[in-house]
Amino acid sequence: MRRPSGDSDEQALALRDSGKTYAAVARSIGLKRAVDAQAAFLRALRRREGEERSRLVDRESSRLVELETRIRSRDADQPEKMERRLQALAKLREHLG
């Protein structure tokens, strides 16, 4: 698998900031997995500073809150599945830093 270029990182950041899922970002820029799109997003985010970075982190944090709400609602009757997804969500938050 190819390593995303800086340009791919910037595309990932722009697409994610526009509200695309990591899976949709990966498809759009030719990556194999959503986790690769997330890594590209995070690399681009780390190159940002100050107010721009804060704005991007706040927007991503808001998306993750919305995702948690959807997970808790959708998977309420499947506690093991919900717990697995919430653990994955915790990792997304941890990587966001």
Please place each PLM-identified region on the residue numbering.
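Residue-level signal for cytosolic alpha-helical hairpin/rod architecture
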Residues: D9, Y22, V65-E68
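Short, basic interhelical loop/turn and adjoining N-cap
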Residues: T21-A23, R27-A40
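Short amphipathic alpha-helical surface patches that mediate protein-protein
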Residues: G30-L31, L42, Q87-A90
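Amphipathic alpha-helical protein-protein interaction segments
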Residues: E60-G97
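Short Lys/Arg-enriched helix C-cap and helix-to-coil transition segments
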Residues: L45-R63, L67
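DNA major-groove recognition helix of helix-turn-helix
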Residues: R16, A40-F41, L45-R48
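Short, amphipathic alpha-helical "recognition" segments used to contact nucleic acids or chromatin
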Residues: R3-K20
